[in-house]
């Protein structure tokens, strides 16, 4: 939470005698935004310094003798690591982590530059995997979120580079990222790290399906396994962060099925997985997911699985069923938001409902309505829905606050 939020909500706590005025001032004092801003400066400075060094070396690289090049790489990397450790021992954690991060960047840059110096030809991303592994080890050594994010970025970009440049998927990179950084995510229970891990994992699953040219539905098996893991996390903010990206992926897939599915032209071989194996895998994940939800007393959230219903295997009515799934899921998110009095969830559910409505509008009217009229009516519908739902949200939240007095 931020200082601004505490300053806004704190007086109400004092008024209800939940805390005293002195306690309120002490709580506000804990959220000094100035200190957070100053703490970020070394990290930003490390990024700029790293870019400056890389650009300088790249501009003059060809004019530097080979032995001096190798010495520069070793000296710069060692200096950054040594400086980082020194500042960390002095208690200047931000600056120490910033220099350690520069050491990690220097290590990766050194791998590339040494390969160029000695004309080494790479046929896979083993060197990048080693770089990511080094970042993972540093993450555990210093328990740093910044080093975690850099390592996660290295693995994600390396995987993309492998599929794009070498046309092969690196299972080793995925395994090291999923096990190493995944366990760190599980330990820290940090919302930001969990969001980033979930996004990277889903993207890498997409790369796997595309690279192997597998039926697209296989994508949802590892993705929903990630969702299922979120049901066994006690901290709900972390669980939501782990599950939101898989649900967004399923929601987008349902939209695509509504807008673009055509039985006459669609290639089922590119989409449909083997029914027995795929549906069996989903049912198994659903069972484990529901068990976790019941343990956490969140059984009603099993309704989120409606987006994964395998309507695509039916012979007719596929678009209508996926459209209904979109609306039901949107209503569910709205309903849970109102029940929990969670403003973010209400806003998100509102956005999903508006999006579902526009998908239905586009599906039903695009082919036969004049295009200018289509956009005019669509805009009016969007504005009307937005006004109505926002008005309804404010009314319900106001009633909820009134009931607390």
Regions found by a protein language model. Name each.
Residues 1-405:
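Alpha-helical multi-pass membrane segments and their bilayer interfacial helix-loop junctions
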